[in-house]
Amino acid sequence: QAKQPLLWLGGGALESGEAVKTLADAGVTVISSTHGRGILADSHRASLRAFHNSPSVEALISQCDFTLVAGSRLRSNETRSWTLELPTPRVQIDIDPAAASRNYLMDNTLVADCRALLAALAARVQGRIWG
């Protein structure tokens, strides 16, 4: 139901490149942690890259209406010491149940392998365009 989802990638999603590209091609805004850099090419039109502590990137993030965090810890150096406002609702995918809402409160946490879950999500977006 999101009109403009944000996908935040971390090192736990390193094997998810194909699914992430499918989602980005459909208009999902993608940003990555330092550890998730390269999952989606920085040159992709939907990529906000890994260096996101700037007013212009934060303005783009503020236009999103849903955050899916895939395999990222949302570290302090990537979120202005956890003051960066991430769109809600927020859903986290992590294989480690202890990661649930570790640094940001999540509305839901899916304990799963990012590669499998993002691939399943990408398979469901056929024909869908966001943004």
Provide a role label for each language-model segment.
Residues 1-2, 86-131:
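Phosphate/pyrophosphate-binding active-site segments
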Residues 8-93:
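Glycine-rich, anion-gripping cofactor-binding loops and their flanking helix/strand elements
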